[in-house]
Amino acid sequence: MKRVVFLFGLVIITSCTYNEISICDTDEPTYSDCVKPIIAANCLDCHSNGSAFGELLTYEELKWSIVDGDLIERIQMNENDAGFMPFQGEKLNESEIQILIKWKENGAKNN
């Protein structure tokens, strides 16, 4: 019986994995660690696979929306304003908005 418990414990311990969690540096936000997760959580339900105007699936699409488009302005609007994003969703928190602004100010790099 002790062997069975030992072997079971050994199997459990060796099957555990560790996934490194990406940390978002708010002074130097990166696309992969900071920007992409914000967009995935708040925008992709509508802005993917042709479900709404202005897809945001790729780096290029998102960069255009932030650098050349008006995405920053639209996420800063009041929730009742026409054009507010995310449409019928909760406003992004100030930290998320500042990360997107800082990413744009830093050149909107694909990193």
Model-derived regions: residue spans:
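Aromatic- and Gly/Pro-enriched helix-to-coil junctions and flexible linker segments
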Residues: 16-111
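Sec-dependent N-terminal signal peptides
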Residues: 4-13
